[in-house]
Each structure stands twice: as structure tokens, then as C-alpha cells.
């Protein structure tokens, strides 16, 4: 478990970024607080006829740049502090990608594994009824997150439409929906696809001709880990030499086939014991001699204890918060190029934005168009951050914060909310 209070960490990161830029004291004070916090009580009738009461949150952190955007988490240990921190990080993520959004996040304290599908539907609809007054396609646009999925988004969108008595434009009230009701092509692969573009550009700035034959190790084999393995091997010719899940990892210096490993994981519950590969631990995977390391699982896996042993030349943070602040310093001193999480994994929110644009306009794009537009967005964001890091001689995470906070600050100045 993470020991520190998540929102305290978010505020410290903001204060650190402020050292590298010109920002007024009042603006910094403003940015340390969410603009709106909503806490709701949701009564849900259970299948046995009893009623259970759940607590839900929606935090709209900052809307200077546009409607707030962010996922809805269902977690038994959800806290308001976590939701506030994640809403702050969404604010910086949408800003670094230059999307016309602010940041938001939602959560319900619930163990979804203990609910039937009917109970989940009633909870989803109850949550929308409770927060209806503070969301709209032009005010706050939720999306799936931990333990929520396209089906839950579909129920939520349907409930919103039922209350609003509106049809098509209300598709844009929520993203991450099934394709049949306004979802976007390319959403499933979006996080990994976006990360692949940043890895490609990182290789260029390191002077590599291309990625063909280069090696990558991926910690985590969920949606993002699997798609990243598939894309890096099939589209870029990289060798995926190691992957892992929560039970352990596998290594094969000749490379692993992404689809075969996924099939094995589905049949056996883990990637472990995959034929032709050697079993390794998650800790060993991180310290392999590879060109690219992609932590795509949980937070705080590269710490001051193991940062010195990292041998990769590029660390692509596909997961949220996989590297601690102390480890950041060590990797920077070692000359390792880090692609910080809220740049590296921003493909997801960017394609969510594309979904919203398609909903609002009623014009839908091909998969090729989605990928091409994502490529342009990710590449521009990468160089915005990389050039700032070079110019100020700071590491990539600090640079990403500087780029993002500067954009939010500028919007606040232009609106007259704060002064220079």
C-alpha cells in the first residue's frame, strides 16, 4: 500500500514545478485546491430486496481550459484524497496534451466483485442521478477507470439521456462507451498506441536509427501491456524479451509473441511457465539489460532501492506513478531518458477526447484517422516536454509539469481569475 497521502503528493509535485516557472503566489494557491467537490449518497436496492447505501465522489479540479474530464473508479478503499489527487493529475494530463479540457475524477466506495450485474446497473444509474446537476457534455465528461468498463458507461449514458430527455448529443456525456452507442475506434489500444509514439520519438532524440531489433521489457500484461507488446513487436520490429503480471514474469532473449503469451495467460491465469521462456520475478524484469523498460502495472516499482540497477536507456511510464521522486533523481543522473506517466499514458484520454469530438459533431472517423491524429498529438506533446527539459536542464517529469501548469495558469490569467 502507498503510505503517503495521495493529495499531499500531488500538491508537492505542483510546488516543485512552480520553482521552474514564473507563477504568482495567488495562482499557486488556487491550483492547490479543487474548484468543486461533490460527495453523494446512493441508495441501491440489492437483489435480495434489502437496500445498501453507497458513498460516491466527483471532483472537478480545474476548468480554466474547458470542461473537466476524468474516469469513475469503483474501489472498496476509495478515498476523497485519492480522487482529488487523480483529478489534479488529470488537469495536468489534459493540459500537457493541449486538449480543451480541465481535470476531474469520480469514485464510489464499493467492492464491485460483490455485486451482481443488476446491482451494478442500479448503482451506475443511481450515481448519475446523484451527480446529474454537475455533469454535461460541456461541463464534465466522465469515463471508465478502475473496475468500471464500457457496459457501465452505457448504463450511465442511458440514465443521463433518460433524465435529460435528449438523444444524440448526450452521447458526448461519457466516453469509453461501446462502439454501438458512440464509442470510438482505437479506444482499446489507445494507451499503448500513444505510448509507442513517445517511445519512437525518445529513440530519435537518443540518436537511434530506428527500433528494429531493439529490446523491450514490459512489467504488467493487462490491456496496456499486451497492446504495447503487440505494437512494439509488430509495428516497430522490437524484441519483447520479457513481460510479467502480478504472479511473476517470463524472459526469452529471442523475443516473445504477444498473442501467444496472452492466450497462455488466459488459459493458465498467468504468463508464468510460458513454453520456451525462463520464469523471472517482477524485480528481476525491472533490472534486465534492455533498451526500453515499460512499467505498465502498479505504482512505485522503481524506488531509491533499485533505481541504480536499472539498465534500460528509456523508461516509458505506461502505469501511473511507477517511479518515486527519489528514483527520478537517480535515473536523471544516470542519463536515462524517462517518459513521465502523464505524457506516456495520455493516449487514453486523447482518444476519449476524439470520441467526444465525434459524438458532438456526429461524424465518425476511421481507425487510420484516429491513429494519425493520436500520432500528431503525442509527438507534439513529447517535444513540448523534451524541449522544455533541455532548455531548463530539468528532468522530463518536472518539464511535463512546467508545460502543463503554464497552460492552465495562462488560461486562468486570460479569464481574469488571477493576476500576474
Swiss-Prot record:
The transmembrane residues are none
Please state the Enzyme Commission number of this protein.
1.4.1.3
Q: Which residues form a coiled coil?
A: none
Q: Which residues form the active site?
A: 105
Q: What GO MF annotations does this protein's record show?
A: glutamate dehydrogenase (NAD+) activity; glutamate dehydrogenase (NADP+) activity
Q: Name the top EC class.
A: oxidoreductase
| Assembly, per entry | Homohexamer.
Would you tell me the protein name for this molecule?
A: Glutamate dehydrogenase
